[in-house]
Amino acid sequence: MIRIGHGFDVHAFGGEGPIIIGGVAIPYEKGLVAHSDGDVALHALTDALLGAMALGDIGKLFPDTDIQYKGADSRRLLRTAYQAILDKGYQVGNVDITIIAQAPKMRPYIDAMRTVIAQDLHCDIEQVNVKATTTEKLGFTGRSEGIACEAVALLIKQTGTK
């Protein structure tokens, strides 16, 4: 059996950088406004994984009203959510992430993001795709007011599990 989930996240720029996207620190003059570390890619991916298993969303599992998640490392949140997936007998088939930002440019960091995500999901790097695009200067991302991200996850039932 397979399951598919979709996730979306957005954060506005504010304060000072660097920013963390896909688990990778990216030098930038602005930071991201967030309760946790503001990693839109890992937040969208976490939502996609949780959605695929009908486990709600990142806000349900890690509420922003809970002080323990203030400034939280999104890699830790992703690993915790993924453990819930493994506990239900599923594993990653593949994930596909689209980062939407006018700036900063993501291309130099994409391979590192793929490596980090593959490590956290205990899968091969070939099962992780990360890409970036702009909105051609349209909307809030086009005006460099923030970053958005979408993610899709395909989960596969592990063999030998019920």
Swiss-Prot record:
NCBIfam families listed in its UniProt record: ispF
Gene that encodes the chain: ispF
GO molecular function: 2-C-methyl-D-erythritol 2,4-cyclodiphosphate synthase activity; metal ion binding
InterPro entries: MECDP_synthase, MECDP_synthase_CS, MECDP_synthase_sf
UniProt keyword terms in alphabetical order: Isoprene biosynthesis, Lyase, Metal-binding
Function according to Swiss-Prot or TrEMBL: Involved in the biosynthesis of isopentenyl diphosphate (IPP) and dimethylallyl diphosphate (DMAPP), two major building blocks of isoprenoid compounds. Catalyzes the conversion of 4-diphosphocytidyl-2-C-methyl-D-erythritol 2-phosphate (CDP-ME2P) to 2-C-methyl-D-erythritol 2,4-cyclodiphosphate (ME-CPP) with a corresponding release of cytidine 5-monophosphate (CMP).
Annotated catalysed reactions: 4-CDP-2-C-methyl-D-erythritol 2-phosphate = 2-C-methyl-D-erythritol 2,4-cyclic diphosphate + CMP
Protein name: 2-C-methyl-D-erythritol 2,4-cyclodiphosphate synthase
Enzyme nomenclature, EC number: 4.6.1.12
Lineage summary: Bacteria, Pseudomonadati, Pseudomonadota, Gammaproteobacteria, Pasteurellales
Gene Ontology biological process terms in this record: isopentenyl diphosphate biosynthetic process, methylerythritol 4-phosphate pathway; terpenoid biosynthetic process
Presence of keyword Ligase: no
Family: Belongs to the IspF family.
Subunit structure: Homotrimer.
Needed co-factor(s): a divalent metal cation
Organism superkingdom: Bacteria
Organism: Histophilus somni (strain 129Pt)
Binding positions for a divalent metal cation per the UniProt entry: 9, 11, 43
Cofactor note: Binds 1 divalent metal cation per subunit.
Pathway: Isoprenoid biosynthesis; isopentenyl diphosphate biosynthesis via DXP pathway; isopentenyl diphosphate from 1-deoxy-D-xylulose 5-phosphate: step 4/6
HAMAP family: IspF
Ligand binding (4-CDP-2-C-methyl-D-erythritol 2-phosphate): 9-11, 35-36, 57-59, 62-66, 133-136, 140, 143
Residues at the site labelled Transition state stabilizer: 35, 134
